[in-house]
Amino acid sequence: MLVNLNDVLIPARRGKYAVGLFNTVNLELARGVMEAAEELDSPVIIGTAEVLLPYGPIEDLANLLIPMAERASDRKSVV
């Protein structure tokens, strides 16, 4: 599910655990990260590398990733 970053990081700080940020360079990698997070019942942060921005607007990437995160299981969080 798509959540606010504070909804993930505040519990992580209290629970003394890390939340991984994964830079994704394509949809297959993003899907793989989300599926692994779901299997492990762990929150993840999906990012992208700034060097990739000249290849397409960030809005286009967001239009693809946000629906994927919204469809993700309630058992995990994606920000």
Q: What are these language model-derived features?
A:
Residues 36-44:
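Catalytic domains of carbohydrate-active enzymes, especially glycoside hydrolases
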Residues 13, 38, 70:
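Anion (oxyanion) recognition and catalysis
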Residues 21, 44-59:
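Glycine-rich, proline-tolerant flexible connector loops at the mouths of alpha/beta enzymes
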Residues 1-21:
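N-terminal amphipathic alpha-helix/helix-capping segment at the start of soluble metabolic enzymes
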Residues 55-75:
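Alpha-helix-loop-beta-strand connector modules within alpha/beta enzyme cores
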Residues 23, 33:
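Conserved, mostly hydrophobic/aromatic
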Residues 78-79:
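Conserved small/polar residues in nucleotide/adenosyl-binding loops
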Residues 3-4, 24-28, 56, 60-63:
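Conserved active-site and cofactor/substrate-binding residues in soluble primary-metabolism enzymes
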